[in-house]
A protein has these predicted regions:
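Acidic anion/phosphate-binding donor-loop and adjacent secondary structure
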Residues: 174-192
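Conserved donor-binding/catalytic core segment of Leloir-type glycosyltransferases
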Residues: 188-205, 210-213, 217, 226
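Nucleotide-activated donor-binding/catalytic signature segment of Leloir-type glycosyltransferases, i.e.
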Residues: 229, 235-261
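Short hydrophobic beta-strand element within catalytic cores of glycosyltransferases
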Residues: 292-296
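A short, well-ordered alpha-helix in the C-terminal region of glycosyltransferases
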Residues: 332-347, 353-359
């Protein structure tokens, strides 16, 4: 089978699935990314880098400009995909990130392919003031509509997610060998001046994160806070604050994978203004390193992380006192650290969950083929 991957980076979050498909010699695989180190390679995979937007007239971050830029990048990618087709590479299956400009016209290039997209979590409130976030959400809606299968990788077991139009939810695969604690016993250490990670996915949540950090610092004077935001716009906002941030709050520059892993290994706790602000990769990779999540939200939505899962849950108004209390109890925190690591090893270990992802994709494509041929999908 010919398989085309399309993602922001190479290989990014699709790396475990890519490696699993590449290990099966019957597949011919091409990976198209917007960014990626050209010297990096995966055996059995051909990698191409899609050109960035060439327009110099599209300046700004407003919704209109962001949408124009997305359409232009989608058209440029369409040209690249048509050249692939002319070269003889016509994929049987396309796997791509959903909120991706380069996937906007994937159906125009490969109308006969089975298309599966990996959806992001639904955005937080605040899209009215976040042009890039709004366009990303619109791109995701478009991609979900034109896909034959929608998959959401989450800190949950396998379910069908009715909140995202019947998307299939699968456990996010974590490389537990790489994301592992520094301590031999698997628990993170808790010393004076404990490091606390405050992390959010979207730029719209940065200001809430700042308020949380300042409130925690007022109660725990000796803790060290590190602020992380996954979106480029959010990182830019934090960088602009720079020296104006209170002492004790650190904002790292863009991190390499090793630097990111090492940061997780030195943290005692990870938190966010609300549980929904955290992405599954950051949450689970932190837990795999023995970092204890202290989260505000409804724990019933995260059953694997609830009873005995290594997390502390509370109401939004209790978040700062709960964080302060956790940091004052190193013995209890060490127990939770071990439990957090065990939860990831039990439910999200890459070697255990990826076979299920492969099986689902093969089953979904087989059902799709039967439907295309006029048969039944049962």
């Amino acid at each position: 089978m010919r398989i085309l991957f399309v993602n922001h980076t190479f290989p990014g979050d699709l790396g475990p699935l890519l490696a699993a498909f590449a290990a099966q010699p019957e597949h011919e695989i091409l990976f198209a990314s917007c960014r990626g180190r050209r010297e990096f390679s995966v055996p059995g995979v051909r990698h191409v880098v899609l050109s960035p937007s060439r327009s110099r007239r599209l300046v700004g971050d407003g919704a209109g400009t962001s949408l124009d830029r997305a359409v232009e990048m989608g058209r440029q990618a369409l040209q690249a995909f048509r050249l692939l087709r002319q070269s003889g590479f016509v994929p049987d299956m396309v796997l791509l990130s959903s909120a991706l400009e380069q996937g906007l016209f994937i159906r125009d290039a490969f109308p006969e392919a089975f298309v599966a997209c990996f959806a992001e979590s639904l955005p937080s409130d605040g899209l009215a003031g976040d042009g890039k976030g709004l366009v990303r959400h619109l791109l995701q809606c478009r991609q979900m509509q034109q896909s034959d299968l929608v998959i959401r990788l989450a800190a949950e077991g396998a379910t069908r997610d009715l909140e995202q139009r019947g998307a299939v939810t699968l456990p996010y695969p974590v490389d537990t060998d790489y994301f592992s604690p520094l301590a031999p016993n698997g628990a993170t250490g808790l010393n004076a001046g404990a490091r606390v990670l405050c992390a959010v996915r979207d730029a719209a949540d940065v200001w809430q994160m700042l308020r949380l950090a300042e409130a925690l610092l007022a109660q725990c004077l000796d803790c060290r806070l590190v602020l992380l935001c996954e979106s480029a716009a959010g990182r830019e906002s934090l960088a602009e604050l720079g020296a104006s941030l209170p002492a004790g709050i650190e904002v790292p520059e863009r991190l390499s994978l090793n630097a990111y892993r090492d940061l997780l290994r030195t943290a005692a706790v990870i938190t966010a203004p609300a549980a929904a602000c955290l992405s599954a990769p950051v949450l689970l990779e932190a837990m795999s390193c023995g970092v204890v999540p202290v989260l505000a939200g409804d724990a019933s939505h995260w059953p694997l992380l609830h009873d005995g899962g290594g997390c502390l849950w509370c109401g939004a108004e209790e978040l700062v006192p709960t964080l302060a209390g956790a940091l004052s109890q190193p013995g209890r925190l060490a127990e939770l650290s071990l439990a957090a690591r065990r939860t990831v090893e039990r439910y999200f270990r890459r070697q255990d969950v990826i076979p299920g992802h492969l099986a689902l994709l093969h089953q979904a494509r087989a059902a799709w083929l039967r439907k295309q041929q006029g048969g039944t999908t049962s």
